[in-house]
Amino acid sequence: MADDYNWFIEQVKERTGIDLNLYKETQMKRRLIALREKRNYQDFRSYFTAMTNDDTLQNEFLERMTINVSEFFRNRKRWDVLDETIIPQLLKEKKRLKVWSAACSTGEEPYTLAMILQKHLPLKDVSILATDIDRAILQQAKVGYYTERSLKEIPVELKEGFFTKDRAGYYVSNELKQAVTFKQHNLLADRFERDCDLIVCRNVLIYFTEEAKRELYHKFSEALRPGGVLFVGSTEQIFEASKYGLETNETFFYRKV
């Protein structure tokens, strides 16, 4: 069984460039076994062979492998710190901001960023790049259609100003859409941005091995300009941030030295 799974992850890496060894094995293996059994394959070899001949199966695998749990203003108090403290600090240094929402899932995070940033400066003076490994999820983010539940933390004035309701949910405004550029990107394999003022990567690194986390912290640090800030999730505190050329600014916010 172990050899079967190890063979599978090697084949996936060769075919897609995605290294499943960098994810926590217990969680990833459980997720993939459930998907394989759902499609009635007895082992990973037969499942991989089927995937190579069926794009639908491969896309389903990629979607299942990624973590697509998101909502607007998730962990609201942290976003308040970004709004009230971090962004004013960044704007003391420059008047145009380059922002990267890494592993953006269905788009709630970059649209949250746009709603906050427009309070401080015209959106034409902001570059927001939003990336994810999952093409289907990015397409969903570009459409910008959301359920009532995912909007529950949005302040009323922002909800009324930037969303249009229909019978089943809400469409995000064109103003916010135009402020965000979506792009496919693999955190574990692709080249990172440079000279970012703010990088947001939240509730993603918990799924990676410690080795992968260390590599990503180094790469995020290199992607920031001096004085730029990395904003991580509420379970992702960086211990020994100085190893990565970072210092704690506020809780879960790290400034590049």
Curated annotation (Swiss-Prot):
The keyword NAD does not apply. It catalyses: L-glutamyl-[protein] + S-adenosyl-L-methionine = [protein]-L-glutamate 5-O-methyl ester + S-adenosyl-L-homocysteine. Pfam families: CheR, CheR_N. S-adenosyl-L-methionine binds at residues 68, 70, 74, 109, 132, 186-187, 202-203. GO terms for biological process: methylation. Residues 1-257 form the CheR-type methyltransferase domain. Its EC number is 2.1.1.80. It is an enzyme of class 2 (transferase). Gene3D superfamilies: Chemotaxis receptor methyltransferase CheR, N-terminal domain, Vaccinia Virus protein VP39. Keywords: Methyltransferase, S-adenosyl-L-methionine, Transferase. GO terms for molecular function: protein-glutamate O-methyltransferase activity. InterPro entries: Bact_Chemotaxis_MeTrfase (IPR050903), CheR_C (IPR022642), CheR_MeTrfase (IPR000780), CheR_N (IPR022641), CheR_N_sf (IPR036804), SAM-dependent_MTases_sf (IPR029063). Methylation of the membrane-bound methyl-accepting chemotaxis proteins (MCP) to form gamma-glutamyl methyl ester residues in MCP. PANTHER family: CHEMOTAXIS PROTEIN METHYLTRANSFERASE (PTHR24422:SF19). This is Chemotaxis protein methyltransferase. It comes from Halalkalibacterium halodurans (strain ATCC BAA-125 / DSM 18197 / FERM 7344 / JCM 9153 / C-125) (Bacillus halodurans). The gene is cheR.
